[in-house]
Amino acid sequence: KALDYASKVKGKLTAAAALQTANIYSRESKWDDALKALDTIKEDQEPAIVEEAALFKARILLETKGEKTAFDALNASLISMPYSKALHYEAAMLAERLDDIKTAEFHLKKAIEIDPGFANAYNSLGYTLLEQTKRIKEAERYINQAYQLDPRNPYILDSKGWLAFKQKKYIKAIEYLNDALKLQKELDIYLHLAEVYWTQGNKRKAA
């Protein structure tokens, strides 16, 4: 019934109806049908819906075709939406998964340029530099900026803790990581905390 209704929608609501149609098909794992519905949404339609459709398409392609195809689709969408911080952010996440750190850094910096208050972008950039490069001072600057913007974000607290660990500030690292775990019981945070305890020689707590 929902599909019948969506197919009859005309005018300004056509793009929203197509997005809803794609959602319905995706819930049934009918990926090709979902992609066809998304492809009916044109660049000159409602910007928020066009952006959401581009992100949705990338998620489907990631599920069905892999990181490279999804990344290429996002890049294609960015040609018509170069000021979408969400598209730049998702492109960065995929670039990192493809081990293309330079491209990930580019997209995260573009997202920050578009929205200087984008805490998650600062955090992702800082954490990526911390893990993938030797630019620890630069990583620290981005992570601290993220923390100033959103000090109760568990993922940012995790980054603060991991940064402190890399700087051999183990007590501070434990504080940040425990604060993160109070907000979000996440495996990666537990693993970071365990590594801090192990490095300290506290194997009982590490276990």
Q: Residue ranges of each PLM-predicted region?
A:
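Structural marker of alpha-solenoid helical repeat scaffolds
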Residues: V9-K12, D44-E46, S80, I114, ...
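Residue-level recognition of tetratricopeptide repeat
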Residues: T14, N23, A48-V50, R59, S84, M93, F118, Y127-T128, ...
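TPR alpha-solenoid repeat register
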Residues: A17, A53, L87, A121, ...
